[in-house]
Amino acid sequence: MTTRIVVAQILGAHGVHGRVKLKSFTADETAVFGYAPLTDESGRREFKLRRTGTGKDHFLAEVDGITGKEAADALRGTRLYIERDRLPAPEDEDEFYHADLIGLDTVTADDQPFGTIKAIYDFGAGDMLEIRHVSEKTVFLPFTKACVPVIEIAAGRVVVEPPANFFAPAGPQPAEGEEMPDGALEALEGEEAGAGTAPQP
C-alpha cells in the first residue's frame, strides 16, 4: 500500500474571485505546484493548482473549478496529499522530507506524550514545528537538534526537549501569600496564554 503524505494546506480564500492562500510543506516550497495529482485526505477529490502570487508565509493560487470566494472559503483547512513514491528518495537514510513529519506524535525525553506535529513554518529565524499539545493548545517549538534530538520516521515518533520554562508565564510572580496588584492577574493571564505560542499564520 502506497503511503500518502501531506505537502500543502489551503489556508482560506484570497479576494473574491476564487483564489486561495496556500501553505507549502515541501523543502522547495514552489515544488508543490509541480506535483500531480494532489488530493484531499480521503484521496477522492483531486486538485489542480496554478500559482498566481506570493503572500506573507504563503502562496496565492487558483484551483481548477473554484471561481468564487464562497467556494474558496469552503476549502479552508483542506490538506493536500501526494503519493509518497512520487517524490524522489532522500539521498541519505537520515534525511527526510518535512512533509514526512506532519501528523507524527511527539514525546518528551522521558517518553511522555507531548503532542502532534501539525505543520512546519519558517518565521524568518529558522524552522518552527507547530504542535498540537496534549493540553489542546497550539505551541511552536524551534526545529533544532537541541529541541528535536530524535526523529524516527519509520516508527512515527519524534522526541522533543522544549527549552527550560517553555510554558512558564513571563514576568515576576508574587511571593506566597502576597496579593497581586489590581490588573496584574489579567496581564499575567494574557502573557501565559501566549507563552510558547505564536499567532496563527
Curated annotation (Swiss-Prot):
MF term (GO), any: ribosome binding
Entry-linked Gene3D superfamilies: PRC-barrel domain, RimM
Stored SUPFAM superfamilies: PRC-barrel domain, Translation proteins
Tagged with keyword Cytoplasm: yes
Subcellular location: Cytoplasm
Keywords from the UniProt entry: Chaperone, Cytoplasm, Ribosome biogenesis, rRNA processing
Function: An accessory protein needed during the final step in the assembly of 30S ribosomal subunit, possibly for assembly of the head region. Essential for efficient processing of 16S rRNA. May be needed both before and after RbfA during the maturation of 16S rRNA. It has affinity for free ribosomal 30S subunits but not for 70S ribosomes.
HAMAP family: Ribosome_mat_RimM (MF_00014)
Name of the protein in question: Ribosome maturation factor RimM
Species this protein is from: Rhodospirillum centenum (strain ATCC 51521 / SW)
Annotated gene: rimM
